[in-house]
Amino acid sequence: RVNQVTPKLFRKASNPLKMSKLSQDAIYKIIKPCGLGPQKSKAIKKLSQILVKEYQGKVPQDIALLEKLPGVGHKTASVVVAQAFGIPSFPVDTHIHRCAQRWGLTSGKNVVTTERDLKKFFPIEEWNKLHIQIIMYARKYCSARDCYGLECPICTSSVSYTHLRAHET
């Protein structure tokens, strides 16, 4: 839903200054389909104001600075630096976490551990590309409910296949 809502929001306000001038209610009406609209609209309004006041309307290219902004967690900050600025980062969402576990690339129980493991496993120059590729692959072949090692070509040939087969029924 974010990918559907973002273009609509950016048509209304294409930069932090314009965004900061929108009312919280106007932002809410656009982003409501994403869920948590009241909290997210408040965060978007506030972070836009901060970007204008403290960063001259520019988005910081540093994960630590981004994480200090309202509503911006580690994954979002990582996506921004990777996709907007091309800075190597390996954002781990639920799709990537699930696939990495199924494929035997991590035994991590959370995205922090999974991110650490994937960064060790893959070369830094591949991180940004792999982030997108794994998400797209997961959506097509290895969804949360539908993949038990049978539909996913990687799961059927990975070290996790035996584990997945053992948990079917």
Located regions from the model:
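Catalytic cores of DNA base-excision repair glycosylases
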Residues: R1-R165
